[in-house]
Every structure is written in structure tokens, then in C-alpha cells.
Regions:
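Generic structural signal for alpha-helix termini and adjacent loop/cap motifs
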Residues: 2-3, 116, 223
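Short, conserved alpha-helical segments within structured domains
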Residues: 13, 49, 130-138, 158, ...
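Short hydrophobic alpha-helical segments that form membrane-spanning helices or hydrophobic packing faces
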Residues: 106, 154-156
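Short, charged helix-to-loop "capping" segments that act as catalytic/coupling loops
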Residues: 40-51, 120-128, 165, 169-183
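All-alpha effector-binding/dimerization core of bacterial HTH-type transcriptional repressors
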Residues: 58-147, 178-199, 203-204
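Short linear motifs at protein or domain termini
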Residues: 1-92, 96, 227-235
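C-terminal all-alpha effector/ligand-binding and dimerization domain
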Residues: 156-235
Length: 235
């Protein structure tokens, strides 16, 4: 956490660590067990084994936040409402600072989704799983390129919570033709947002994205999940 170790670094031997910290082998191994459970290290067994440093994983934070939300009775609608607060603000910020590379990456994501929609309309056998991943990636790009790390981390935690909660509901209830049409509308909305960003129209981009999020909320929480349902990570 102090930045003294990098991802992939190998920790010293057990003997060296015991001497360095003045602890017993059982205490050290218990510390290893806890850090491994928190995805802070990975342990390889054998002659060439040892403990390797892992980068902090957002999914670990999301798991604990999700549990806290569930225990406090937070609804999935409340989680989505928080995204509605964060994303338009991020879009406004992005419009004032966007670079050409940001526009290129957003356009590439939209184009990939457009091609998937066209292919899915022509071939009912094509899976739409990639569509959901691309949609999340577009939102993720907006947050990442807005340039506020605190906002990006908070959004990432909320995304992981929503993905976990909605995964089974979406797979059960989504009608394919409705899903294809929803992705088609997303392509149109995403393209419009990119145009606002290209023009550096921060107010227009923010208004458009808030409307997009409101419409998406009615679709997502109206057909695929109960907005009043408490966050559930164990379905």
C-alpha cells in the first residue's frame, strides 16, 4: 500500500520475513492466508514457489461494498440512481478535456457494437453477450477518460455490484428481439453523445447522457430487474 512493492514482485522467504518482523511461522502464514484471501498476493507451492504481489483488485472492494449494501437493505434502483448522478457529471467533465484518442476509442466501441447488432439481426444464432460487454465498456471509457480517479473507482464498484446482481435476471428475462432493438438504440444514443463530446458541448453532452440514463433505467429496471429489490450477491 506504500508503493514499495510492484505487481509481480516476489516477497522474501518465510525465514527472512520472520526475522524482519519478529513473528513466528504460524503468525506469518496466517498473514499470508489473509492477504491471499484479499487478493493482495498469490502463493505458489513447490521448490520454486513463494508469495507474489498482486495489484489491488476493484472486485474485492466491490464484494465488500456489495455486502454492506445488501445488509443495509439498499435497492438496485438506488444503486442505479447513484450511477445517474456520477455518469452525467463525468460526461460533462470529459467534454471539456477530451482528446482525439478518447473520441477514437469511443467511436471504435460504438462501431463494434453496431456491427454486432447488424450481425445479430441477420443471424439469430449469434450470442449477444458481447453486446453487454461493449455497452459496459463504453460507459467505462466515459468514466476513465473523465480523468477523476476517485470517481472512476466509485463507479467501478457500483458497476461490479450491478453486474453481479443483474446477471441472472437478465439471462432469464431478456427477449432476444428486444435486446437487439435495445442495443440498436444504444448505438444511436452513443453516437449522439460522441458528437457532443467532439463539439466540446459539455452542457449538451450532460443533458443527453442524463436522458439516456433515465431511459435505460426504465428499460433495465422495468423489464429485467425489480428496482425495489434489495441488492443480492448470492442469487
Amino acid at each position: 500500500m506504500l508503493g514499495e512493492l510492484r505487481e509481480g514482485d516476489t516477497l522474501p522467504s518465510e525465514a527472512d520475513l520472520m526475522a524482519q518482523f519478529g513473528v513466528s511461522r504460524p503468525t506469518l502464514r496466517e498473514a499470508f492466508r489473509i492477504m491471499e484471501a484479499e487478493s493482495l498476493i498469490s502463493i505458489r507451492r513447490g521448490a520454486r514457489g513463494g508469495a507474489r504481489v498482486l495489484a489491488p483488485d476493484l472486485s474485492v472492494a466491490a464484494r465488500y461494498v456489495g455486502l454492506l449494501l445488501q445488509l443495509s437493505g439498499t435497492t438496485i434502483g438506488e444503486v442505479y440512481d447513484t450511477r445517474v448522478i456520477i455518469e452525467p457529471a463525468a460526461v460533462h467533465r470529459l467534454a471539456t478535456r477530451r482528446k482525439e484518442r478518447d473520441l477514437e476509442d469511443l467511436r471504435a466501441c460504438v462501431e463494434e457494437l453496431r456491427k454486432l447488432v447488424e450481425a445479430a439481426k441477420a443471424d439469430p444464432g449469434i450470442s449477444l453477450d458481447a453486446g453487454s460487454r461493449l455497452a459496459w465498456r463504453f460507459h467505462e471509457l466515459l468514466i476513465e477518460r473523465a480523468g477523476n480517479r476517485a470517481m472512476a473507482i466509485q463507479w467501478g464498484v457500483l458497476r461490479d455490484v450491478m453486474e453481479t446482481h443483474l446477471a441472472s435476471a437478465v439471462s432469464r428475462s431478456s427477449d432476444r428481439s428486444d435486446a437487439v432493438e435495445s442495443f440498436r438504440r444504444s448505438v444511436r444514443s452513443y453516437s449522439k453523445l460522441v458528437a457532443f463530446l467532439e463539439a466540446k458541448d459539455a452542457e449538451g453532452a450532460q443533458r443527453h447522457w442524463r436522458k439516456h440514463m433515465d431511459v435505460s433505467s426504465k428499460i433495465l429496471l422495468g423489464t429485467e430487474a425489480d428496482p425495489k429489490a434489495v441488492v443480492d450477491l448470492f442469487d
